[in-house]
Amino acid sequence: MIISVKEIKKFIICVLIPILIGYLSFLISTLISQTSFEIQYLQLIKPDFAPSSDVFQIVWPILYVLMGISYYIVIKSQKSTQKIKEASFFYYLQLALNFLWSVLFFGFNLRFVALVEIFILMLILMAMIYTFFNVNVKAALLNVPYLIWITYAMVLNYFIWILNK
């Protein structure tokens, strides 16, 4: 199977978009708060099950790559345009919410607002996985680790909010 340069570019763009959005969210959060993510995270009172800040720097890039690959699979599928549009809507909506969470939590220190927002993100992510499933099962399954991580992050967000009131 020969893959065109155009397809390789499309794949790379699909993978880079979530990575860049994630990077920008942490950059903007740092600019707003004038403190890096690592320093803020270290200063928080956290529950015993909270990971070290290094874990986030490993997990998020992996999740962003999986998101990008899954979206590429969706847009390359032979399913109806309507199904792809619906999946794309939820994909970009969850990316926007993903971006916003870091700004709320780290940029503005709005822990409770971030908690509400991550709950909405989790619901939108479930809708995205469902719409991806209707297009391509593998694309949907690639996002299950993301859903698990977001659920964990939501629980962590809750306890950090409670412990740091």
Name the predicted role of every residue range.
Residues 60-72, 94-97, 121:
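Core segments of transmembrane alpha-helices
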Residues 131-165:
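Terminal transmembrane helical module of multi-pass membrane proteins
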Residues 2-6, 75-85, 133-141:
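Membrane-interface helix-boundary motifs at transmembrane edges
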